[in-house]
Amino acid sequence: MAGENDLNDRVEALEVRLAYQDETIEALNQTVTAQWKQIDALTRQLAALSERLDQAESSAGAPANERPPHY
């Protein structure tokens, strides 16, 4: 009987650990999903800013050979 109780206690302890691990995995999954959404949004924002910078550089043209205002 003592061995059977010990086995039941061990199984119960494993079930508790498994339940906590499932909760942890779910929390980590939610965190990773949120981070990927943020990374995706930041990537799109960076691409848009890069395009705006390219457009600004191309529309500005070459700098004129003018003297600076302090001359």
From Swiss-Prot:
Which stretches of sequence are listed as region Disordered?
52-71
**Transmembrane annotation, as ranges:** none
The record's Gene3D superfamilies line, in alphabetical order, gives: 1.20.5.300
State the Pfam families in the record. Answer: SlyX (PF04102)
- Identify the domain of life: Bacteria
Give the residue range of the signal peptide: none
Which InterPro entries does the record match to this protein?
A: SlyX (IPR007236)
Q: Which family does it belong to?
A: Belongs to the SlyX family.
- Please give the HAMAP family that the UniProt record associates with this protein: SlyX
Instruction: From the Swiss-Prot or TrEMBL record, give the protein name.
Output: Protein SlyX homolog
Q: Which organism is it from?
A: Rhodopseudomonas palustris (strain TIE-1)
- Lineage, please? Bacteria, Pseudomonadati, Pseudomonadota, Alphaproteobacteria, Hyphomicrobiales
